[in-house]
Every structure is written in C-alpha cells, then in structure tokens.
UniProtKB/Swiss-Prot annotation:
Mg(2+) binds at D144, N173. The keyword Oxidoreductase does not apply. SUPFAM superfamilies: Thiamin diphosphate-binding fold (THDP-binding), TK C-terminal domain-like. Pathway: Metabolic intermediate biosynthesis; 1-deoxy-D-xylulose 5-phosphate biosynthesis; 1-deoxy-D-xylulose 5-phosphate from D-glyceraldehyde 3-phosphate and pyruvate: step 1/1. One of its GO terms (molecular function) is thiamine pyrophosphate binding. Homodimer. This is 1-deoxy-D-xylulose-5-phosphate synthase. It comes from Listeria welshimeri serovar 6b (strain ATCC 35897 / DSM 20650 / CCUG 15529 / CIP 8149 / NCTC 11857 / SLCC 5334 / V8). Belongs to the transketolase family. DXPS subfamily. CDD domains: TPP_DXS (cd02007), TPP_PYR_DXS_TK_like (cd07033). It catalyses: D-glyceraldehyde 3-phosphate + pyruvate + H(+) = 1-deoxy-D-xylulose 5-phosphate + CO2. Its EC number is 2.2.1.7. It comes from the Bacteria. Keywords: Isoprene biosynthesis, Magnesium, Metal-binding, Thiamine biosynthesis, Thiamine pyrophosphate, Transferase.
C-alpha cells in the first residue's frame, strides 16, 4: 500500500484482517527505511504497529481520543493520520515532531514527551466528557515502564474510584529505555507467565458478565474466537482491586486478538485495562535482540547490518567523563553512592553499577523519590550523586526545595543533557534548570568549560559540605582535552579569566566558552580587544570580579544556552541593581521566554544569536553604542 497517500484512518474500516496484516507489514518496512535515514524512536514504534492499527480500526479518531504516554511510540499513529509524506523531515528544524503535537494534527489530542502523564490527562477528558454529556471514548496508551511512575499510580487510584468509562491500554514490552525495576514490574511479569494465561470458560464468563446487556452474547462470541479463552485473565488482582475491569494479557502482534478484546472493552461499563504484550523492535532483528535499550532511540543506521552511521567522535561523552570521575572518587570513598531515575545507560552509570552494585540505585521513573532518597542518604553521612537529565529534574522541584536545599544537605546533582538537546524538542530541552534552581537558597550551580574542569568540579562538589552542589553538563561529546590530574579544588564562586578584557568582556560558561573564544579571536583581527571570562559558578556569582569589571567601565556581554528569564545574565543584572550601579553597559544573549522546538543544536543556536557570528555582532553593537555615549558626554 502507498502509505504516502493516506489522508486519515477512515480507509481502514473497509479492510479485512489479511489486508490489515499487509498494512502492518508495509508500515514496518516504511518505519525501518525512514528512520534509518533520520534516526528516531524505532524500537518502540515497531512494537506497536498492530496495536495502533487495531485502535484506529476500532475507534474513530479524532472523536475518540488517543493519548500516547511519553509519545515516542506515536509514529504509526502519525502515518495512519496522514503524515507519512512528512517523515523525511522527522525531528528536523521546522519538520515533523517526534512526539504528538496538537498544532500538527487534530488527531494529536494531547502532547506528551515525559512519562506517566497520559492517565491523568485521560481522567480530565472523561470528566469533561461526562459533565458536557458528550459521547466518545478516551483511550490512554501507557507502557509498563511509564506505569511505574508515581503520577500514573495517582491517576489509577482516582480513575478506579470514579468508575467512569475509560479504556486503558497497557503496552507491556518488558523493556523501557533501561530494564524496568520495581514491584509493579514484577507483578506484570507474573501476569505474563501465569498459568491463567490459559483461561477456562468459567473465568472468562466471570469477566464478561460485568458487561451490561451484551454480556451473554459476547461470552458466546469469545468462546468461538480463536485463542480468546486464554487471553481474558481474571488474575489481574492489582488492577481489579483499584476498580478496573482487567483484560489480558493478550498477544500484541495478533490483530484478531487485539480487535476482539477492544470490542469487549468498548462494551464494558467503567474503567477497563487491556494488558497487551508486545515486542519492542518487532520485525527488525537488531532491534528485537536489543537488551540494553540501544534501539529505543537511534541516529541513522544501515538497514542491512543494523550498524549505526556515526559521526567522527574524537572525545568521550560528557556523561562518560562525569561517570568515570565518579568511579574514581567512589573507589577511594565508600560513602559515595549513585542514584538514577531509569537512565543508567544514558548517564553512563553501567560501569559504576557493576563495580559497586551495593552503592548503585536505579529507582525507575521516580524523580521525586530519587531526590528525597538522596536527601535521606545525606542525613546519614553518605555522599549521594543524583544523575538526572535536566528536563527530568524539573519533576522533582518540590523535593529539591523542601528536602534537599532547605536542610542544606550534601547532595551532588549531575544535571545531564543541560542546554539544548536538539531532535527531541520542546519536552526535552534542558533550558529551564538554571532559572528554577537560581531561586532556591543554598544551591550551588556550576558548569565546566572542558573535561578537566568537569573532573575538578566533581572533586570540589564531593569536598563541599555546606549543602547541595549541581554540576551541569551537555549532551554529546567533550572537547577531547587531555585529562590531567584532577584533584584540584576550585574555590567556591571563583570565575576564571581566560582572556584579560580591555575593550569589552564576554562572560559565559560551559560549551559556549568555545564560541566566545572564537569570537574574541576574530574580533581581535578587527582591532577589538575583548576578554573572555569562564563563569563556571553560575551561582554564586564571582562578585569580586564583577565589581572590578563594572568599576573599570568594561562593557559586559553575558552568553548562555539557557533561558534569559531567571537565568545567568538576569543574576548579573540583579547584582548590578542590588549594588546600586548605574550607567553599566551590559547586554545578554540567550534563549527567549518560549518553548524551543526540535532541530539540530547548531541551527537552533544560530537562530537565537548564540553563535560566533551572533557574539561578534553584539559586541560591535555594544562598543558602537558606548562610543556614542562617550561622544555625547564630551
């Protein structure tokens, strides 16, 4: 079938089971070919092909509402709703989003990106539906990994208590980005392997008779349907105790089974959970055999071999630099422990976990728990390192304020993926942490300019004993500088003068130091003597150096790959105001007060002037303005 000609899902209603299976094969082939060029979340999407087809066949989108938890598994949904012809722009600047996007299609009714949100959103939708006396189905699709998130439990509790009609699809592939952990994961494993996977008619009747009016007829139909007896499982006690009707587990790649059970779920009253067992990467062997989460999300790859097409990398990743230093420090200090909320692979903590299994804790998708657990460890003299992506740290804001910072507990926070992350877009950009951490008392915020300084900040952080210490580091690879001895302590709040300022100064931190240095070099060839300051301590500021530069009337340009509102430059402006300085020439470059869309990081940075050319232009504008002011005074 020509998938590029699909306009909406209505065509599927005319297809028989064989044609639906052929459609599934075509979609798999398309996904593999397409993502081999663009990269993307290929593993999750190959696992939900039949499920997504069955959902669109059974229900009527957009009247009926699909909510894709996390949203990375929505590619098949996008194809069936008329967006296959945009897949060559997938995750590119201005192109097709890798997650559901309301402005992209009327079929994307709720935007996702972080996990465990779908059930709460669905809860709100069914309440609104019933208040307005409307008639449509609400179907959240949530994975077994996302179901471990605390927010999902809160929603299950409320939905079960309300008893309103809703169909929850539990997409159980036994594999999130990293192996699932926790008691609920063990419950699901028992359900998958239970003897009651082979059900008797008596047990099926017990479930189906909860369905009003049509219960008797459906029981007879189920008896005649191939394999239906073994797929309606009574022993979903956990969900039933919460007030849900439980169906499953069923084979998530058997269209007949899925369609039959969706029809049963449609006729039931009250909340229903349909437990669908799928295989992540289904239909593409390299992805099917993946046990580490490598094929969860990828860059371009060769279809024939399953090998990734990698850009030339001459340096280890920032995550590796941090985790290797953590290993070195933990070898010498048994009080150091590592905590991650379901990101051991991305944060490069697998070696630590192997070397120190009793001091490594993957708590699952539980950022709030991870943060307060770190606080608890700190009260007992341990030295916890919380490795967490910037975008996920915002989920633990109250715990940072109430449990960590308020008590001045010694928790080292490794803020991974700080700054722009590119293709994953709005929901994953690490651009808010400076703004929301800046306002919390007792918090130290840092960011290294290179690998050596990263190691030095790690040493400094674990030596610091007066409260929490955050180290930000970006996605991607370091600069490749030689890793010299790293036991040097950096005085708290001390910046580094890399180039002495004369005409103007660029004050920045992290990766943008390199942009500043290149801009300063170019400006020097044009006769401008511009200094570069490494503001490795974002909080506290180096007040001594700031006083000095301001008194010398040196124009200041702050540059940051983060939000201007509440950001580093805003802190410098606040310092100027607090100290009653007037007539200070200061400008800021950074990100505006908006959500930043997907695309390559260099393209996004360039569009906001966070580039060598952007810095050069702003410095020239500042100096020209200073000359005009000077001339006026004369």
């Amino acid at each position: 079938m020509d998938l590029l000609k699909i306009k909406d899902p209505s065509f599927m209603k005319q297809l028989d089971i064989k044609e639906l299976e052929a459609l599934a094969a075509d979609i798999r082939a398309f996904l593999i070919t397409s993502t081999s060029k663009s990269g993307g979340h290929i593993g999750p999407n190959l696992g939900v092909v039949e499920l997504t087809i069955a959902l669109h066949y059974t229900f009527n989108s957009p009247k009926d509402k699909f909510i894709w938890d996390v949203g990375h598994q929505s590619y098949v949904h996008k194809i069936l709703t008329g967006r296959a012809n945009q897949f060559d722009t997938l995750r590119k600047h201005g192109g097709l989003d890798g997650f559901p996007k309301r402005k992209e299609s009327i079929h994307d009714v709720f935007e996702t990106g972080h996990s465990s949100t779908s059930l709460s959103a669905a809860c709100g939708m069914v309440i609104a539906r019933d208040i307005k006396k409307e008639d449509f189905y609400v179907i959240p699709i949530i994975g077994d990994g996302a179901l471990t998130g605390g927010m999902a439990f809160e929603a299950l509790n409320h939905i079960g208590d309300m008893g309103k009609d809703m169909i929850v699809i539990l997409n159980d592939n036994d594999m999130s980005i990293a192996p699932n952990v926790g008691a609920l994961h063990n419950v699901l494993g028992k359900l998958r392997t239970s003897d009651k996977f082979q059900q008797t008619k008596t047990n099926i009747d017990k479930l189906i008779r909860k369905i009003p009016t049509a219960g008797e007829k459906l029981a007879d139909t189920a008896e005649k349907t191939k394999d239906s007896l073994k797929h309606l499982l009574v022993n979903g006690t956990f969900f039933e105790e919460l007030g849900f009707m439980y169906l499953g587990p069923i084979d998530g790649h058997n269209l007949e089974d899925i369609l039959t059970n969706l029809e049963i779920a449609k006729r039931a009253r009250g909340p229903v959970i349909l437990h669908v067992v799928t295989k992540k990467g289904k239909g593409y062997q390299p992805a099917e055999l993946d046990s580490r989460g490598t094929w969860h999300g990828t860059g371009p790859y060769k279809v024939e071999t399953g090998s990734f097409i990698k850009s030339v990398k001459t340096a280890p990743s920032w995550s590796s630099v941090i985790s290797n230093e953590l290993m070195r420090l933990a070898t010498a200090d048994e009080r150091i422990v590592a905590i991650t909320p379901a990101m051991p692979v991305g944060s490069k903590l697998e070696k630590f976990a192997k070397a120190f299994p009793e001091r490594f804790f993957d708590v699952g998708i539980a950022e709030q728990h991870a943060t307060t657990m770190a606080a608890g460890l700190a009260t007992q003299g341990m030295k916890p390192f919380l490795a967490i992506y910037s975008t996920f740290l915002q989920r633990a804001y109250d715990q940072l304020v109430h449990d960590v910072c308020r008590q001045k507990l010694n928790v080292v926070i490794g803020i991974d993926r700080a700054g722009l992350v590119g293709a994953d877009g709005e929901t994953h950009q690490g651009i808010f942490d400076i703004s929301f951490l800046n306002s919390i008392p007792n918090m130290i915020i840092t960011m290294p300019k290179d690998e050596v300084e990263a190691r030095q900040l790690m040493v400094t952080a674990f030596d610091y004993d007066a409260g929490p210490f955050a180290i930000r580091y970006p996605r991607g690879n370091g600069l490749g500088v030689e890793l010299t001895e790293s036991n040097t302590l950096i005085p708290i709040g001390e910046w580094e003068t890399i180039i002495q300022p004369i005409d103007a100064v660029i004050v920045t931190f992290g990766p943008t130091i390199q942009l500043a240095l290149k801009a300063a070099d170019q400006l020097e060839t044009e006769g401008y003597r511009v200094g570069v300051i490494n503001a490795r301590f974002i909080k506290p500021l180096d007040e001594t150096l700031l006083h000095q530069m301001i008194k010398q009337k040196i124009p200041i340009l702050t540059v940051e790959e983060s939000l201007l509102k509440g950001g580093f430059g805003a802190s410098v402006l606040e310092f100027i105001e607090t100290n009653n300085y007037t007539d200070v020439a200061i400008h800021r470059i950074g990100l505006p007060d908006e959500f930043i869309s997907h695309g390559s990081v260099p393209v996004i940075l360039e569009s906001y002037g966070i580039s060598e050319a952007g810095i050069e232009l702003k410095i020239k504008e500042m100096l020209a303005q200073s000359e005009k002011l000077r001339a006026k005074r004369l």
